[in-house]
Amino acid sequence: MIQAILVFNNHGKPRLVRFYQRFPEEIQQQIVRETFHLVLKRDDNICNFLEGGSLIGGSDYKLIYRHYATLYFVFCVDSSESELGILDLIQVFVETLDKCFENVCELDLIFHMDKVHYILQEVVMGGMVLETNMNEIVAQIEAQNRLEKSEGGLSAAPARAVSAVKNINLPEIPRNINIGDLNIKVPNLSQFV
């Protein structure tokens, strides 16, 4: 089972942190720091697996990582997971990010955190691998994007509110709405029309 997924840059700044086991925040920060120091001091031509038993609390935990440009992608897993399978999973996750963001970079992980988390949830949920087919993952992401566009998102909410008021066909827009003891002053909507 996957215990945690960590993505941090060359300077140790976390860009994505997802724990699938409950830890206090101080312990999570310590795990991220120690993982960064363990991974950073390894040479690029050394094996991408290392023991992480003392980090997460058991002797059967491993850290499996890949280094892409300025980012380290680290999966903390227990002994039941295949190291090569997790390396392939990291590759699938990164290539999916690359397809969704058209040449993904660190800034995409910073400014599109919600989308990155959604992509990760399509791949891994609750520490279990859900999907490894990149085309299927991208199709789900595109379906989600179409749904968001059809709903208009939050940015279109003010325009929808104004058009809803216009569609009421009131002869005159009320200036005050009284509901019991509650008195609501209606703003001048003519400036939005």
From Swiss-Prot:
Q: Give GO cellular component annotations, separated by semicolons.
A: AP-3 adaptor complex; axon cytoplasm; cytoplasmic vesicle membrane; early endosome; Golgi apparatus; intracellular membrane-bounded organelle; synaptic vesicle
- State the name under which the record lists this protein: AP-3 complex subunit sigma-2
Q: Principal place where this protein is found?
A: Golgi
Q: Which UniProt keywords apply?
A: Cytoplasmic vesicle, Golgi apparatus, Membrane, Protein transport, Transport
Subunit info here reads: Adaptor protein complex 3 (AP-3) is a heterotetramer composed of two large adaptins (delta-type subunit AP3D1 and beta-type subunit AP3B1 or AP3B2), a medium adaptin (mu-type subunit AP3M1 or AP3M2) and a small adaptin (sigma-type subunit APS1 or AP3S2). Interacts with AGAP1. AP-3 associates with the BLOC-1 complex.
**Which family is this protein grouped under?**
Belongs to the adaptor complexes small subunit family.
* Tissue expression remark: Present in all adult tissues examined.
* Coiled coil regions, renumbered to chain: none
* Record-linked Pfam families: Clat_adaptor_s (PF01217)
Presence of keyword Membrane: yes
The family database entries (PROSITE patterns) matched by this protein are listed as: CLAT_ADAPTOR_S
Q: Which SUPFAM superfamilies match?
A: SNARE-like (SSF64356)
Q: What does this protein do?
A: Part of the AP-3 complex, an adaptor-related complex which is not clathrin-associated. The complex is associated with the Golgi region as well as more peripheral structures. It facilitates the budding of vesicles from the Golgi membrane and may be directly involved in trafficking to lysosomes. In concert with the BLOC-1 complex, AP-3 is required to target cargos into vesicles assembled at cell bodies for delivery into neurites and nerve terminals.
Q: How does it sit in the membrane?
A: Peripheral membrane protein
InterPro entries in the record, alphabetically? AP_complex_ssu (IPR016635), AP_mu_sigma_su (IPR022775), APS3 (IPR027155), Clathrin_sm-chain_CS (IPR000804), Longin-like_dom_sf (IPR011012)
- Subcellular localization: Golgi apparatus; Cytoplasmic vesicle membrane
Biological process terms in GO annotation: anterograde axonal transport; anterograde synaptic vesicle transport; clathrin-coated vesicle cargo loading, AP-3-mediated; Golgi to vacuole transport; intracellular protein transport; intracellular transport; melanosome assembly; platelet dense granule organization
